[in-house]
Curated annotation (Swiss-Prot):
GO molecular function: aminomethyltransferase activity; transaminase activity
Family per similarity comment: Belongs to the GcvT family.
The reaction(s) this protein catalyses: N(6)-[(R)-S(8)-aminomethyldihydrolipoyl]-L-lysyl-[protein] + (6S)-5,6,7,8-tetrahydrofolate = N(6)-[(R)-dihydrolipoyl]-L-lysyl-[protein] + (6R)-5,10-methylene-5,6,7,8-tetrahydrofolate + NH4(+)
Entry protein name: Aminomethyltransferase
Subunit structure: The glycine cleavage system is composed of four proteins: P, T, L and H.
UniProt entry keywords in alphabetical sequence: Aminotransferase, Transferase
Top-level taxon in the UniProt lineage: Bacteria
Pfam family, one: GCV_T
Gene Ontology BP terms: glycine decarboxylation via glycine cleavage system
GO cellular component: cytosol; glycine cleavage complex
Keyword Cytoplasm attributed: no
Entry function: The glycine cleavage system catalyzes the degradation of glycine.
Length: 365
């Protein structure tokens, strides 16, 4: 994996016996020795988990009119939020497909920090840079910041133990300091639990990681890899780009229309998305809950009770909370909530009930 990039915490992961694998061009921990996906998942649901997600992209858009420019490109409406708030948004292509889903941190009208997915950072930066007007700069800051996600019921206690603010509203952020070092603290996450995402400077990330674990000894704090991150987000029905969202899957199909500023005059993909919304999508993202032992996996075909093909699984896993197989699938427009469908599991039908996620209660706010 010599061609893969590494986070500033690579050495910490190796010391913890992490199983490392490539993800989005980065060598990242999937699970940790002596723990595993199940225990790490349960730590987040019951106590607190600490994730290294420093592989996530970062890009800064600065200059006079920076926020206005971002708003004319990305799907959501920055006019809905004030400085000090973050917003989930989409970078779409002309056909309405999703090039990436990302978080926009609005500092001011002259500064927006974007956090794309790792594999798509360069493309998002290139698209924005090519469209930027005079006076607006788009700077790749992929290795300018680390990202630590602290998630779970005990997350506020742990973050507060470091002297960092914890009382902000959901999706709000502050520029704080820890031991004189700058760190952005945002009330957000990808797990459905109360949580925070901390963005220290890249080189400060190991020290902050160590401090979190030192303070978390009595709280049941656990390192959490990308394996449990996937089971946690799937239980919430949160989409993953490259599976549930992609350049050929639109926000209308993926039920992400809430992240589109439909009243805006300009954003990439606007005409195609307005047309699709008016006509109705040919397929929609649904949840699948196994009624037997089958576990849905990406790309498995889905058929109706009569055997007719109706779609394909986009995400699937075993739910540690529910102890059953769950998944997300793009299904034909005629499929409805409560329908029984079958997933082709190595040539055998796996019965599933069509449901609306989340699969378990969410408490992020």
């Amino acid at each position: 994996m010599a061609d893969l990039r590494r986070s500033p915490l690579y050495g910490r992961h190796v010391d913890l016996g992490a199983k490392m694998a490539g993800f989005g061009g980065w060598e990242m921990p999937i699970e940790y020795a002596g723990r595993g996906v199940l225990a790490e998942h349960q730590a987040v649901r019951g106590a607190v988990g600490i994730f290294d997600v420093s592989h996530l992209g970062k890009a800064e858009v600065t200059g006079a009119g920076a926020a206005e420019f971002v708003n004319a490109c990305l799907s959501n409406d920055l006019g809905r939020i004030a400085p000090g708030q973050a917003q989930y948004t989409l970078c779409c292509n002309d056909e309405g497909g999703v090039v990436d889903d990302l978080i926009a941190y609005l500092f001011s009208g002259e500064r927006v920090l974007l956090v794309p997915n790792a594999a798509n950072n360069a493309e998002v930066v290139a698209r924005l840079a090519a469209a930027a007007p005079a006076g607006v700069s788009v700077t790749d800051r992929h290795t300018g910041f680390g990202v630590l996600a602290v998630q779970g019921p005990a997350a506020p206690t742990l973050v507060a133990a470091l002297g960092l603010p914890t009382d902000g509203a959901y999706m709000s952020f502050v520029e704080a300091a820890w031991k004189g070092r700058p760190v952005i603290v945002c009330r957000s996450g990808y797990t459905g639990e109360r949580g925070y995402e901390l963005l220290p400077r890249w080189d400060d990330t190991p020290a902050l990681w160590d401090a979190l674990f030192a303070a978390g000894e009595g709280l049941g704090a656990s390192p959490v890899g990308l394996g449990a991150r996937d089971t946690l987000r799937t239980e919430m029905g949160y989409p993953l780009h490259g599976q549930d969202l992609s350049p050929t899957i639109t926000p209308v199909q993926a039920r992400s229309g809430w992240a589109v500023g439909w009243g805006k005059e300009r954003f990439w993909g606007r005409e195609a998305l307005l047309a699709e919304r008016a006509a109705g999508p040919a397929r929609l993202l649904w949840g699948l809950a196994s009624t037997g032992r089958a576990i849905p996996r990406p790309h498995m075909p889905v058929t109706a009770a009569d055997g007719a093909p109706v779609g394909e699984v986009t995400s699937g896993t075993f739910s540690p909370t529910l102890r059953q197989g769950i998944g997300l699938a793009l299904l034909d427009r005629g499929v409805a909530e409560g329908d029984t469908v079958n997933v082709d599991v190595r040539g055998r039908p796996g019965p599933m009930t069509v449901v609306r996620p989340p699969f378990v209660p969410s408490t992020p706010r």
